[in-house]
UniProtKB/Swiss-Prot annotation:
InterPro entries cross-referenced by the UniProt entry: PsdUridine_synth_cat_dom_sf, PsdUridine_synth_N, tRNA_psdUridine_synth_TruB, TruB_C
Gene: truB
HAMAP family to which the protein is assigned, alphabetical: TruB_bact
Family from the record: Belongs to the pseudouridine synthase TruB family. Type 1 subfamily.
tRNA processing recorded as keyword: yes
Enzyme Commission code: 5.4.99.25
Top-level taxon in the UniProt lineage: Bacteria
SUPFAM superfamilies attached to this UniProt entry: Pseudouridine synthase
Keywords, comma-separated and alphabetical: Isomerase, tRNA processing
Record protein name field: tRNA pseudouridine synthase B
Entry function: Responsible for synthesis of pseudouridine from uracil-55 in the psi GC loop of transfer RNAs.
Organism lineage string: Bacteria, Pseudomonadati, Pseudomonadota, Alphaproteobacteria, Rhodobacterales
Length: 301
């Protein structure tokens, strides 16, 4: 007999406006506890000191997490010029200083190298695995790591403000796997003055926006109540970047069993990824081929 999972079978998304000083895992655990949910996971880690959008998937919505982690994300952050730290943010020990301060024009010129397809070396204190161990664990032990550069798509990177000579506020829209701390570090090096992230906020992630997020304080206040459920968004929100194909009754039945099922296609092309719905409910995600959806993920709703 299968093991019974404890908790309520809730499926959907809860968008949390994560506060500084809390890990992404701690937020997920709080959401799971507050909703008494059987299953929960987040769609993209935020550093403990960062704030903003942390999209928490519940139940069957965890099957749509890859579509959010792969989506574009927007970050606003302040770079502190003139100082490098061990962690590339304000929490770390200062390891280098400079009296040089670039002009706005010099910063703008330097940003050009950080747009488009770039190669980025993760921070020493990051979750990247090195021979099975997390980089931050090795860095805490004093090791200096030679981390490999990784590709990153930067859609845009713009100056928002220049409060003073020591600071510049930036906004970046990027793809999966980007480290804002690396941008601040490398920008400082490119300008010859060092730099680190003073503060960081993720303003949106795929279809989810910070202004629609619920605070951790509100989660605590509404914990274990039906009122908290009203903040849970539909599972389909995580599929916003994929075309929706209505399934026929027979097609929906076949899809639920993991078999190709007939769908009503409009302008979806052969081989394109899409999701099927029936009577307003998501049924499956898969590849469209000749009038049928071939499922890769099936939702048990």
């Amino acid at each position: 007999m299968g093991r019974t999972r404890k908790g309520r079978a809730i499926s959907g998304w809860l968008v949390v406006d994560k506060p500084a000083g809390m890990t992404s895992t701690a937020v997920v655990n709080k959401v799971r506890w507050a909703l008494e949910a059987q299953k929960a996971g987040h769609a993209g880690t935020l550093d403990p000191d960062a704030t903003g959008v942390l999209a928490v998937a519940l139940g069957e919505a965890t099957k749509t997490v890859p579509y959010i982690t792969d989506a574009l994300k927007c970050y606003r952050f302040m770079v502190r010029l003139g100082l490098s730290t061990r962690t590339d943010d304000a929490s770390g020990e200062v390891i280098a200083t400079s009296e040089a301060r670039p002009t706005d024009a010099e910063i703008e010129a330097a940003l050009a190298a950080f747009r488009g397809e770039i190669q980025q070396v993760p921070p020493q204190f990051s979750a990247v695995k090195v021979e099975g161990e997390r980089a931050y664990d090795l860095a805490r032990d004093g090791e200096r790591l030679d981390l490999a550069a990784r590709p990153l798509w930067v859609e845009s990177l713009e100056i928002l403000s220049r409060p003073d000579a020591d600071h510049v506020e930036l906004e970046m829209v990027c793809g999966k796997g980007g480290y804002v701390r690396s941008i601040a570090r490398d920008l400082g090096e490119a300008l010859g003055c060092h730099g680190h992230v003073a503060w960081l906020r993720r303003t949106w992630s795929g279809p989810f926006e910070a202004e629609d997020g619920i605070s951790v304080a509100t989660i605590d206040e509404l914990a274990r109540s039906e009122a908290l459920l009203s903040h849970v968004l539909p599972l389909a929100k995580g599929l916003a970047d994929l075309p929706e194909l209505p399934a026929t009754p027979e097609g929906a039945a076949r899809l639920r069993c993991g078999n190709p099922g007939m769908v009503i296609a409009s302008d979806v092309e052969f081989g394109e990824e899409a999701w099927a719905s029936f009577q307003g409910q998501p049924v499956a995600v898969g590849i469209y081929k000749s009038g049928e959806l071939h499922p890769s993920r099936v939702f048990n709703l």
